[in-house]
Amino acid sequence: MESLFIKLAKYPIIKTERLVLRPVTLDDAEAMFEYASDKENTRYTFPTNQSLEETKNNIAQFYLASPLGRWGIELKSTGEFIGTIDLHKLDAVLKKATIGYIINQKYWNQGLTTEANRAVIELAFEKIGMNKLDAFHDKDNPASGKVMEKSGMRFSHEELYARMDKNEPGRFVTDVHYVLTKEEYFANK
């Protein structure tokens, strides 16, 4: 039986109506740095990048060293790189993963993140054979929860004192968790 990783390797590119999800390369560094260096854009995701070199290093360590289940989000109409989406915490035995995403704030509120999320969810259940996907967001970032809801995920629970904020020293984060099982996905398709 084909492993989850072999199945993922077969889908380096996913196309949607307005997007191309494709491997991230060092050529994406400047476009990624545009949002990765913006404190408002990275507020709830990862530490704000301080230099283009830091962004290049992050691309090499995160996307190039381990590319399976990680895609850059590109606008089909212009070829512009606008964000990333990934399946992480992959568990090949239980066939579950966590979805994470970030998009340049110039493209917020246009349904693009939801479109990318739906495409990854469809791939995970229909092609890869996943059993469960989850996602979480900082309680102070309800817009991310709306993406999860619009993508078919359901609220699971709140986790108080889940972690320390990466951008605001001393702040405890409450994470809001969403989940979608294969049974729920196919029942609502």
Residue spans for each PLM region:
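Conserved GNAT-fold acetyl-CoA-binding loop/helix
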Residues: 40-61
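Juxtamembrane/interface motifs at transmembrane-helix termini
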Residues: 51-54, 63-65, 76, 102-104
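Generic hydrophobic, helix-prone segments enriched in Leu/Val/Ile
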Residues: 8-11, 49, 63
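Acyl-donor (CoA/ACP) binding surface of acyl/acetyltransferases
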Residues: 1-43, 70, 74-189
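A short helix-loop-beta-strand connector motif used in the catalytic cores of GNAT acetyltransferases and
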Residues: 60-72
